[in-house]
């Protein structure tokens, strides 16, 4: 492991190795900038993941109550349960669902679109869809987002098929399995989704994009 002088201002220090920190640190390093990524949690490899909800929750979650504020909780039956934040290399890219949607046109300019709504502080973004389009495209290629860059969509499970039948009957013009950062076919050395259903516990096939093994592999 490389060592750096604490007074060396040429070294970039990135806090966290999730979607933001892991991606930024990887890009900086690949462009020749000496970079250190600091991560509070340990490193788990794909073979460490298990199809066990509670087992993996205990292994990868950050259970420190200081990570949340206030007394609101998602579930009343586990009132002391903090927000689900992963404390490990890869951060929440280990347990995210993989949904990768672009902002719709009106979402960039919500103040203009919806007007001045009493009690709400809506603001327009200083950027728009056209400006972000090439960056979206670059991210979608790196993440392997389905239905972009010629990548086919994921197959629908039985639940989806029932929902789609209803959507078709109601006249919906578009209903599909979404744009997901999960390989629908082998790509860049990683396999395709096996429909195991344990995306939140870490992808055992590596089909789902995570900074853990895509951007900061050993």
Protein language model regions, located:
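Conserved redox-cofactor binding core of oxidoreductases
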Residues: 75-76, 104-107, 112-218
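N-terminal glycine-rich phosphate/pyrophosphate-binding loop and immediately adjacent elements
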Residues: 2-116, 121-130
């Amino acid at each position: 492991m490389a060592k750096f002088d604490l007074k060396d201002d040429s070294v970039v220090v990135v806090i966290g190795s999730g979607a933001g920190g892991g991606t930024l640190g990887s890009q900086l390093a690949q462009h020749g900038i000496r970079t250190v990524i600091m991560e509070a949690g340990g490193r788990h490899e794909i073979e460490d993941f298990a199809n066990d909800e509670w087992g993996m929750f205990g292994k990868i979650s950050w259970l420190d109550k200081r990570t949340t504020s206030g007394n609101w909780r998602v579930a009343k039956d586990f009132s002391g349960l903090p927000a689900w934040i992963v404390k490990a290399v890869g951060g929440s890219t280990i347990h995210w669902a993989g949904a990768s949607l672009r902002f719709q046109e009106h979402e960039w300019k919500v103040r203009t679109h919806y007007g001045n709504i009493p009690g709400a502080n809506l603001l327009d973004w200083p950027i728009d869809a056209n400006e972000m389009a090439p960056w979206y495209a670059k991210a979608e290629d790196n993440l392997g987002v389905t239905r972009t860059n010629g990548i086919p969509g994921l197959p629908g499970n039985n639940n989806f098929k029932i929902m789609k039948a209803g959507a078709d009957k109601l006249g919906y013009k578009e209903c599909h399995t979404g744009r997901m950062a999960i390989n629908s076919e082998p790509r860049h050395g990683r396999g395709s989704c096996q429909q195991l259903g344990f995306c939140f516990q870490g992808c055992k096939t590596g089909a789902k994009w995570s900074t853990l093994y895509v951007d900061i592999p050993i």
